[in-house]
């Protein structure tokens, strides 16, 4: 007895256990096994079911694997180099690891071969109620072992051997390659030399026996001759397929033997294995390729299969190589004329190509309407439709199932079978495949419908990927490249439509309604997440707006899920809920019931935001009965809050938790207004907060009175309701903060930070949040208020709460902790709070608060009243001087304070080492002080008039009365009066007068009484002196100089002054020297103003008003800017006319030259 049949140690002893033993008596078509299988993929035309999820570890680790799957009995026979394994996949129900019988095989001498697995097959039993037999062929030695049943093979280790053995006489370097069952008890074996052997398992009497017979073919005869001549270098013949029609087929007596080169031999097994036809199909195949693929090269036949319904129809799988990849094609031939086959159908595999040549198998479905091309990493289903009238009229299309070899390990086994589950059920067609790491799967074809269009195909494939690609351990590869071929707008529309189908439970891949609505909602939410995960994993080019829309769907689904959970937790039925009865009635117009509520939650997820408005409206309607039914009204408010909080908070929670899925920040939004922060939602949230607060305030104020009207047990209920409302108010505050923050971020993202709309929302948020936080503090939830303020970085509220809740050292410690925690932003808010609340001196208290940010604060704020003191304390006199100068220049309006600030600034400048910047600031300070000095000099002549009129009772219209007194009997133009009124008003208030306005006032001295001017200094001199301290443009300075000199000339009547009749020299000299023009020239010369930049007119005619259009005049002359430019122009023109009159009628120009010479000699 050989080692194959000899007693061996069976390591799988558990296989013999009655509990785990394979039962072949069990019904082979038990539907329970199929119904409980796990679907890896369910498509419209097919589904992929997991029949066995895991092999035994010994099988997985014993590579390479081969084998076959016998669907009649539900067994799998798997071969390796060391053993063969038998297992039943039907008892695993798709998940469990089944009992496995192991048959160790003897080691063989490689004999120069790289090694090959044993050839094995189940042998059908003579009786239907018996186990099948087992046939094992060792490929190198040619030894054959046969057992009439698996039980006998299993008992080989324990009892006397009950098997039979034979031997194939192989030539040197010959090995067995293929094993084919031609009838139940007859098998055909082919070798690498092309020889064929017939193995008969019954003798003529029908008893079990093993007999081997060599086929009488040309190749066999040739091999025999070479053997007798002792020539052993036989040519190797690459037989790729050894196929016979299915058992019980009328054509089963034929055997087709195909070689890779295209050679085909047909044997008739009834005629003692006679060769009836031999041909070379390569010319036919090449002719087909030349018509469709001119660049094809390297034609090779990979496999053949025979149509089970038409034994004359044989399909071949051929491949060829173009410039880049290997391409595949199915060519079907009709062998009605066995010597001259004709081409019936050609189907190139458009959806598959490979860079290297892959081992491939071709299978027909039992109906002949489908072909399965099984490769290592893919299964291609080719659907073939046949016209009943004309067999040549055939169309085909294909479905591709790609396998992830990293998960599955690659397909090593495949077979086809047709089974019927029941008497009246529709026959199904299946292909069974096996992979090392993912077990056995069944591909069941149940439809041959062609997709309506490309978009429907893409949507269906995308939907399949969403529902099945994320199943744990799924070996199918869903990385569909065709998604990138569709246009971007179409793909985005498909994605959004699919999301809506999932959200509204319209997808056919969603499971039937669970008993628990919570599970159904969770399934939909998970599917939406998987849709986004798949889009991200495939790196599809979709716009971010699509992702925002999907995120909104997920938010609403999550909100409904949490809301339903709240209902299930808090209210076991709708009848226990006061608010949901009314809400469902309003929304569905039907009686409130559990089913109505459930139906609404199933089909109205998209309208979940309506519940917020409905809950709030019901609260308002119930509020009118608070005196009659206080507890019921508080319950309604509490339930409404539960609804609103569940919806709003869960939406934000989903957005936060799904950031990794969507790769979208929680602070970014789509173009549409976020549904959780629409203007209507913000209003409703604020009103609900106020409503809850009002109910709490009333309950706190009237607790004792209300409790007296209740029974003892109801008092505890009331306290519990009030406590719950307080907790809800804290949660409502957070929801309101989230909604407003979200609204602000969306407007900033859409319109920018400077949009007018955002300012309105920020102002409303600033007002409301102080109210919300203060409310929490008022009801005794100060710690919660501080927590919320900390969470949302509401620094202003934090500061206010600290001053409300803490005192002295506790307050100092809290503020210092926040300064350390939040840094400069909190510091700025705190410092602003000090200034706004009259606590500015706190900023100078260096012992109490951290001042590390104070310098930066003063740089960013215009608080010069305090910041200069801080700079002075730090010894930064330059900065202190600069701040004082800014304060005096831009902010201060009172004369005395401005003079003090400028004086201090000057003092600080003297304390700083001199540099160019300090010199400029010092000049500016001197000029400002000079302006104030001139103003004070002028006001001294006005204030006595003011005091006199006040003592006379002139309290009303005092300014007009003072101006009238100053003008006296003179006639002044309107613009002169207006300038005087403005200046006098500021004199009375002690305010600073602008330099240009004071210039105008001084230059209008010709319209005031003469007795107002004291001493030798004229107003015109002061005006020129003031002009030197200003920083006007050159044009403006020239205009003012001419105006001042012109009005100084017009101040006196030169016709009278220069009239010498009846005057002696002394009188003439006195009048000449007392003129305003002379005194102004004298004062200017004596005080050196001409050396400081003032230009003396060369002639008085140059002082005329000429060459100014209205626009230029407005830009340089304030009275023209604030008044009527036409009237101002008339006044200036009249002055020029009068000046020209003097120059024409008198020798004023000569006198002016004499005045200049006289002043020069002083």
Curated annotation (Swiss-Prot):
GO molecular function, one term: structural constituent of nuclear pore
Localization annotation: Nucleus envelope
Gene Ontology CC terms, in alphabetical order: mitotic nuclear bridge midzone membrane domain; nuclear envelope; nuclear membrane; nuclear periphery; nuclear pore; nuclear pore outer ring; nucleolar peripheral inclusion body
GO terms for biological process, alphabetical: kinetochore organization; mitotic recombination-dependent replication fork processing; poly(A)+ mRNA export from nucleus; protein import into nucleus; replication fork processing; transcription-dependent tethering of RNA polymerase II gene DNA at nuclear periphery
Any single Pfam family the record assigns to this protein: Nucleoporin_N
Superkingdom of source: Eukaryota
InterPro entries tied to this protein: Nucleoporin_Nup133/Nup155_C, Nucleoporin_Nup133/Nup155_N, Nup133-like, WD40/YVTN_repeat-like_dom_sf
Cystine pairings recorded for this chain: none
Broad class of the protein's primary localization: nucleus
Keywords: Nucleus, Transport
Family assignment from sequence similarity: Belongs to the nucleoporin Nup133 family.
Subunit structure as annotated in this protein's UniProt entry: Component of the npc107-120 complex which consists of nup85, nup107, nup120, nup131, nup132 and seh1. Interacts with nup107.
Job description of the protein: Functions as a component of the nuclear pore complex (NPC). NPC components, collectively referred to as nucleoporins (NUPs), can play the role of both NPC structural components and of docking or interaction partners for transiently associated nuclear transport factors. Active directional transport is assured by both, a Phe-Gly (FG) repeat affinity gradient for these transport factors across the NPC and a transport cofactor concentration gradient across the nuclear envelope.
Protein name according to UniProt: Nucleoporin nup132
Native species: Schizosaccharomyces pombe (strain 972 / ATCC 24843)
Lineage: Eukaryota, Fungi, Dikarya, Ascomycota, Taphrinomycotina
């Amino acid at each position: 007895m050989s080692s194959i049949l000899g007693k061996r140690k069976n390591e799988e002893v558990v296989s013999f256990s009655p509990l785990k033993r394979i039962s072949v008596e069990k019904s082979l078509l038990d539907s329970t096994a199929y119904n409980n299988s796990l679907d890896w993929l369910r498509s419209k035309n097919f589904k992929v079911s997991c029949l066995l999820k895991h092999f035994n570890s010994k099988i997985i680790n014993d590579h390479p694997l081969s084998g076959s799957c016998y669907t009649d009995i539900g067994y799998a026979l798997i071969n390796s180099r060391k053993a063969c394994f038998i297992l039943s996949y039907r008892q695993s129900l798709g998940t469990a690891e089944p009992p496995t019988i192991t048959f160790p095989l003897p080691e063989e001498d490689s004999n120069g071969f790289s090694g090959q697995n044993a050839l094995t097959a189940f042998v059908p039993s003579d009786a239907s109620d018996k186990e099948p037999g087992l046939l094992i062929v060792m490929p190198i030695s040619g030894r054959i072992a046969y057992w009439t049943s698996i039980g006998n093979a299993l008992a080989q280790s324990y009892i006397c051997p009950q098997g039979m053995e034979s031997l194939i006489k192989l030539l040197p370097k010959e090995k067995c390659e293929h094993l084919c069952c031609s009838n139940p008890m007859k098998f055909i074996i082919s070798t690498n030399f092309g020889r064929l052997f017939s193995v008969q398992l019954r003798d003529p009497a029908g008893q079990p026996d093993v007999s081997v017979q060599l086929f009488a073919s040309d190749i066999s005869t040739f091999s025999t001759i070479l053997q007798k001549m002792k020539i052993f270098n036989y040519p190797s013949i690459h037989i790729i397929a050894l196929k016979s029609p299915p058992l019980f087929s009328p054509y089963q007596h034929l055997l087709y033997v195909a070689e890779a080169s295209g050679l085909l031999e047909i044997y008739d097994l009834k005629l003692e294995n006679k060769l009836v036809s031999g041909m070379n199909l390569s010319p036919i195949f090449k002719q087909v390729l030349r018509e469709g693929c001119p660049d094809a090269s390297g034609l090779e036949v990979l496999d053949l299969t025979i149509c089970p319904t038409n034994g004359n129809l044989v399909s071949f799988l051929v491949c060829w190589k173009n410039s880049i990849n290997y391409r595949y094609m199915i060519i079907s031939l009709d062998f009605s004329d066995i010597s001259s086959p004709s081409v019936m159908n050609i189907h190139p595999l458009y959806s598959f190509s490979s860079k290297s040549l892959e081992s491939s198998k071709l299978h027909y479905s039992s109906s002949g309407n489908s072909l399965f091309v099984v490769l290592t990493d893919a299964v291609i289903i080719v659907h073939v439709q046949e016209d009943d009238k004309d067999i040549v009229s055939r169309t085909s299309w294909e479905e591709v199932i790609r396998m992830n070899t990293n998960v599955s390990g690659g397909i090593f086994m495949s077979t086809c079978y047709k089974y019927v589950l029941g008497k009246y059920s529709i026959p199904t067609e299946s292909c069974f495949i096996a992979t090392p790491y993912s077990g056995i799967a069944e591909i069941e074809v149940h439809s041959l419908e062609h997709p309506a269009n490309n978009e429907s195909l893409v949507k269906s494939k995308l939907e399949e990927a969403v529902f099945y690609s994320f199943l744990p351990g799924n070996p199918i590869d869903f990385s569909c490249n065709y998604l990138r071929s569709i246009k971007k707008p179409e793909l985005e529309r498909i994605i959004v439509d699919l999301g809506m189908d999932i959200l509204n439970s319209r997808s056919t891949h969603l499971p039937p309604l669970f008993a628990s609505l919570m599970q159904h909602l969770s399934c939909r939410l998970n599917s939406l997440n998987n849709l986004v995960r798949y889009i991200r994993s495939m790196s599809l080019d979709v716009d971010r707006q699509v992702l925002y829309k999907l995120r909104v769907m997920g938010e609403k689904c999550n909100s409904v899920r949490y809301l339903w959970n709240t209902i299930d937790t808090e209210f076991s039925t709708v009848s226990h809920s006061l608010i949901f009865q009314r809400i469902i009635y309003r929304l569905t117009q039907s009686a409130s019931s559990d089913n109505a509520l459930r139906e609404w939650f199933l089909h109205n997820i998209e309208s979940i935001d309506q519940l917020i408005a409905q809950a709030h409206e019901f609260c308002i309607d119930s509020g009118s009965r608070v005196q009659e039914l206080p507890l019921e009204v508080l319950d309604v408010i509490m339930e409404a809050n539960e609804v609103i909080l569940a919806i709003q908070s869960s939406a934000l929670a989903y957005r936060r938790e799904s950031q990794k899925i969507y790769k979208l920040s929680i602070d970014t939004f789509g173009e549409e207004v976020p549904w959780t922060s629409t203007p209507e939602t913000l209003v409703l949230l604020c009103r609900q907060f106020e409503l809850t607060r009002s109910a709490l305030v009333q309950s706190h104020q009237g607790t004792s009175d209300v409790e007296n009207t209740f029974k003892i047990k109801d008092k505890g209920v009331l306290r519990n309701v009030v406590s719950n409302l307080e907790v809800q108010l804290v949660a409502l505050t957070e929801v309101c903060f989230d909604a407003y923050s979200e609204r602000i971020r969306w407007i900033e993202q859409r319109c920018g930070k400077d949009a007018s709309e955002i300012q309105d929302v920020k102002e409303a948020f600033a007002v409301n949040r102080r109210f919300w936080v203060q409310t929490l503090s008022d009801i005794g939830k100060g710690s919660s208020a501080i927590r919320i303020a900390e969470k949302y970085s509401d620094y202003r509220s934090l500061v206010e709460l600290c001053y409300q809740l803490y005192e002295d050292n506790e307050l100092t410690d809290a503020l210092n902790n926040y300064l350390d925690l939040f840094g400069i932003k909190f510091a700025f808010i705190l410092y602003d709070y000090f200034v706004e609340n009259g606590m500015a001196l706190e900023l100078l208290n260096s012992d109490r608060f951290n001042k590390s940010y104070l310098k930066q604060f003063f740089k960013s704020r215009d608080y010069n009243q305090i910041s200069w003191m801080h700079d002075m304390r730090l010894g930064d006199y330059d900065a202190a001087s600069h701040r004082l100068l800014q304060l005096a220049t831009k902010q201060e309006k009172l004369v005395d304070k401005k003079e003090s600030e400028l004086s201090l600034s000057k003092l600080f400048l003297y304390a700083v080492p001199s540099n160019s910047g300090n010199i400029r600031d010092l000049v500016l300070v001197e000029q400002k002080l000079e302006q104030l000095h001139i103003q004070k000099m002028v006001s001294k002549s006005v204030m006595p008039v003011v005091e006199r009129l006040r003592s006379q009772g002139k309290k009303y219209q005092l300014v007009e009365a003072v101006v009238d007194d100053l003008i006296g009997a003179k006639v002044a133009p309107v613009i002169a009066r207006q300038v005087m009124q403005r200046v006098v008003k500021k004199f009375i208030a002690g305010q600073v007068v602008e330099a240009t306005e004071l210039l105008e006032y001084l230059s209008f001295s010709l319209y005031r009484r003469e007795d107002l001017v004291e001493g030798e200094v004229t107003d015109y001199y002061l005006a020129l002196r003031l002009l030197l301290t200003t920083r006007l443009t050159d044009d403006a300075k020239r205009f003012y100089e001419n105006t001042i000199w012109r009005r100084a000339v017009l101040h006196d009547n030169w016709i009278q002054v220069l009239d010498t009749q009846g005057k002696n020299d002394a009188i003439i000299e006195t009048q000449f020297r007392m003129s305003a023009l002379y005194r102004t020239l004298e004062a200017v010369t004596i005080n050196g103003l001409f050396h400081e930049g003032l230009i003396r007119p060369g002639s008085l005619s140059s002082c005329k008003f000429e060459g100014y259009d209205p626009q230029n005049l407005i830009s340089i002359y304030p009275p023209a800017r604030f008044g009527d430019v036409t009237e101002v122009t008339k006044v200036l023109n009249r002055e020029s006319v009068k000046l020209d009159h003097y120059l024409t009628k008198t020798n004023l120009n000569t006198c002016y030259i004499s005045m200049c010479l006289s002043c020069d000699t002083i």
